[in-house]
Amino acid sequence: MTMAANLARRLIGNRSTQILGAVNSSSGAASSVARAFCSSTTPITATLFPGDGIGPEIAESVKKVFTTAGVPIEWEEHYVGTEIDPRTQSFLTWESLESVRRNKVGLKGPMATPIGKGHRSLNLTLRKELNLYANVRPCYSLPGYKTRYDDVDLITIRENTEGEYSGLEHQVVRGVVESLKIITRQASLRVAEYAFLYAKTHGRERVSAIHKANIMQKTDGLFLKCCREVAEKYPEITYEEVVIDNCCMMLVKNPALFDVLVMPNLYGDIISDLCAGLVGGLGLTPSCNIGEDGVALAEAVHGSAPDIAGKNLANPTALLLSGVMMLRHLKFNEQAEQIHSAIINTIAEGKYRTADLGGSSTTTEFTKAICDHL
């Protein structure tokens, strides 16, 4: 059996069928993110943010594929507003946030925030308001789609609520600005616990804490201290600490050295995109944000690509695979595996691929090919 086939069997089999786990931060005990919603045939309601640019097109692909696969889901759609909602201080409406809180699960297309316009980031608003503390991104080589690496199979887990993304910036004097990096014990323990629980639940053997504590001794030092505390509770899992610059070099040289990586916010933003580049880009990379009380918001992390919006050229793979993560969260494992296999097989065959994957198919044609595999 070829390396690609072996990898495909692993991805579509054991690890990928596991559900995401959450952590009860008050007790430290593990709880299932896949809440006992209902059986796999009872319809549930999920919030859908089609997003900007190509978002509505790839969201339509998801709806079509889910319908073809017989997924018992009803979508509650919310769009970005045209004016800032004072309750959220962004273009996201309060009603859309309440929808996710009520449904406990959602899927989000790409959302664009104008740079330097004084608007609160839409993605940051979602993470903060919904307390989505962990961003989980599986990164794996796709059989049949050739990149520089054939054996990538790792998970990045990013602390999602603090660090340099706390939004605490100000001008000290003219020409001098200051940004505060916030690291707390509570948030660090929470994401570390999630990372080790994820590793244990998914049969992963190693957790790497990524840091720059040699320079930022207080902030990253606290993060590492919390990771060490949690690691002691999981002796069966190998724990290591890797300085972020060395981590980048090691990932590019040999990504197979890593399994699960956990890190503060900014490092996670950078490393997760680097990992996506190892397997073909953000257009192939799923993502899911985990919150407390069983909330999960899966998302496509690529841009809104306004230059091709409305031209039927967008690649829906990332949003589809994120939708698969959402289905596993909901315990719709059978439909999740069917859709996952259909996506993998369509890309592997190579007959129908969008332009970014080296093909000439439209969004509609690519989506239809996936549906045909179902």
Swiss-Prot record:
Keywords: Magnesium, Manganese, Metal-binding, Mitochondrion, NAD, Oxidoreductase, Transit peptide, Tricarboxylic acid cycle. It catalyses: D-threo-isocitrate + NAD(+) = 2-oxoglutarate + CO2 + NADH. Residues 1-44 form a transit peptide. GO terms for biological process: isocitrate metabolic process; tricarboxylic acid cycle. GO terms for cellular component: mitochondrion; plasma membrane. Its EC number is 1.1.1.41. GO terms for molecular function: ATP binding; isocitrate dehydrogenase (NAD+) activity; magnesium ion binding; NAD binding; zinc ion binding. Mg(2+) binds at D245, D269, D273. It is found in: Mitochondrion. Its cofactor is Mg(2+); Mn(2+). The record marks Y165, K212 as: Critical for catalysis. PROSITE patterns: IDH_IMDH. Heterooligomer of catalytic and regulatory subunits. PANTHER family: DECARBOXYLATING DEHYDROGENASES-ISOCITRATE, ISOPROPYLMALATE, TARTRATE, ISOCITRATE DEHYDROGENASE [NAD] SUBUNIT ALPHA, MITOCHONDRIAL. This is Isocitrate dehydrogenase [NAD] catalytic subunit 5, mitochondrial. It comes from Arabidopsis thaliana. The lineage of its organism: Eukaryota, Viridiplantae, Streptophyta, Embryophyta, Tracheophyta. The gene is IDH5.
